[in-house]
């Protein structure tokens, strides 16, 4: 009986460890590892993310099993276990930002660049004969070497349907020193004729590509971006 109890506890701790890891992401892709395993379901008018539900259920029942054996005060009821499960997932995602930066610090090329997605956003203001790209890209060089590169921003789907251009290549060349955090402010105009008089995007979901003569690194957009891309 004790062997079964020990196995149950060990399995519960292993599940918690796996969820902790899978709630993270690589920064290059904003989707968590859990979301990449349990991919969102795309409907005509939206997306259903069920990976979060699976994560909560796994953490909840792991906590329940631990409480059944250990009688832990803070997880002895349905509500307390649910609250702890949600906090556990939030803390896992938060801690992942630090582990990702540590991992990137071992690179000596563009893979050492970390993007602060919460501080990065881009506007596309499209008039009949002109497209203005402006916004802020917040990055950190996690390595001990200087990194130099240019940036491409993937064209928003509705704009791409009219100009047939995959990326806007920004003219500014970026140089970022070791361990430096930089906010890059963008404001560039491109001459294009649009079928529609006005299109406006103000989002932080876009895909960005950092590139130089040696290599490139892609920071993928959110699932919402690719959902919209599939509509056009």
Predicted regions and their residues:
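Low-complexity, acidic Ser/Thr/Pro/Gly-rich terminal tails and inter-domain linkers that flank the onset
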Residues: 95-129, 158-160
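Intrinsically disordered, low-complexity Pro/Gly/Ser/Thr-rich segments with frequent PxxP/GP/PP motifs
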Residues: 165-195
